[in-house]
Swiss-Prot record:
Positions carrying Phosphotyrosine: Y47
Gene Ontology terms: biological process: peripheral nervous system axon regeneration
Superkingdom to which the source organism belongs: Eukaryota
Lineage per the UniProt record: Eukaryota, Metazoa, Chordata, Craniata, Vertebrata
Modified residues (Phosphoserine): S69, S261, S277
Main location: endoplasmic reticulum
Signal peptide: 1-19
Alphabetically ordered keywords of this record: Calcium, Endoplasmic reticulum, Glycoprotein, Golgi apparatus, Membrane, Metal-binding, Phosphoprotein, Repeat, Sarcoplasmic reticulum, Secreted, Signal
Protein name, UniProt field: Calumenin
Binding site for Ca(2+) 2: D117, N119, D121, E128
Residues that, per the record, bind Ca(2+) 6: D278, D280, D282, K284, E289
Binding site for Ca(2+) 3: D164, D166, D168, E175
């Protein structure tokens, strides 16, 4: 399926989805959870393992002996200590946890990288991305299906330029990640806001009124009554979204809606790990302090064996 067919299919699917009276579109960007486990260190350290390693890598540590687990953890600590001062700070731990938290994003970028890096130089230029994505349209700007791809391409180019911090129109892997997942980067949040405003602000007055807000997430189906969640969203708009009560959301109000300041779970977990492992209470961790508490950070066959006994007893 070429790009035109894909986008037309996507448009039809979107239209079909929006026609369902009870289906809701959610534009709010939330941080992914650190783990789906309960955080209860009195029972086990599964939550901490997922937060520190990521859920998939945490499973692999359950197959290691304690000695193997400690050795592998030591190698991870060397990578976390980015300034190579022999200590792991709360900030360095937070960065590690954030990376594990967003592993699915990095995996998504890796899966797409080879498709766009046409000359295999480890970078993706705007020309490479445009040619792969819009090559068919560039060859035939007036397609038979009548679909106009130019606005989409212009929007992509604007976002690419925003992600490209040094302005050379060539994206590193980190810049390409920011292009594909702008909501994850502080310096890209303005473009997320701009694109959202363009999508919802139908009369282009620079604001989102109540009907535009509801219309973006709900398509009214003839004479059918509005579902309860739509009535709730109307109340949310009046009571919470429209903070200055002028009947519409400006850019700041819209930004607060789609990019809320969530509780920072990664920071809280980093603080917890330091508190539990910092034997000399100097506010930072040595490699030895971390490895001594390997069961908290990563676990092993031994720690999982204890949990397995509990699970066996439950059966």
């Amino acid at each position: 399926m070429d790009l035109r067919q894909f986008l037309m299919c996507l448009s039809l699917c979107t239209a079909f989805a929006l026609s369902k009276p009870t289906e809701k579109k959610d534009r709010v960007h939330h941080e992914p959870q650190l783990s789906d486990k309960v955080h209860n260190d009195a029972q086990n350290f599964d939550y901490d393992h997922d937060a520190f390693l990521g859920a998939e890598e945490a499973k692999s540590f359950g197959q290691l002996t304690p000695e193997e687990s400690k050795e592998k953890l030591g190698m991870i600590v060397d990578k976390i200590d980015t300034d190579k001062d022999g200590f792991v700070t709360e900030g360095e731990l937070k960065s590690r946890i954030k990376h594990a938290q967003k592993k699915y994003i990095y995996d998504n970028v890796e899966n797409q990288w080879q498709e766009f890096d046409m000359n295999q130089d480890g970078l993706i230029s705007w020309d490479e991305y445009r040619n792969v994505t819009y090559g068919t349209y560039l060859d035939d700007p007036d397609p038979d299906d009548g679909f106009n791809y130019k606005p989409i391409m212009v929007r992509d180019e604007r976002r690419f330029k925003m992600a490209d911090q040094d302005g050379d129109l060539i994206a590193t892997k980190e810049e390409f990640t920011a292009f594909l997942h702008p909501e994850e980067y502080d310096y890209m949040k303005d473009i997320v806001l701009q694109e959202t405003m363009e999508d919802i602000d139908q009369n282009a007055d620079g604001f989102i009124d109540l009907e535009e807000y509801i219309g973006d997430m709900y398509s009214h189906d003839g004479n059918a009554d509005e579902p309860q969640w739509v009535k709730t969203e109307r109340e949310q708009f009046v009571e919470f979204r429209d903070k200055n009560r002028d009947g519409k959301m400006d850019k700041e109000e819209t930004k607060d809606w789609i990019l809320p300041s969530d509780y920072d779970h990664a920071e809280a977990e980093a603080r917890h790990l330091v508190y539990e492992s910092d034997q000399d209470k100097d506010g930072k961790l040595t490699k030895e302090e971390i490895v001594d508490k390997y069961d908290l950070f990563v676990g092993s066959q031994a720690t999982d064996f204890g949990e397995a006994l509990v699970r066996h007893d439950e059966f």
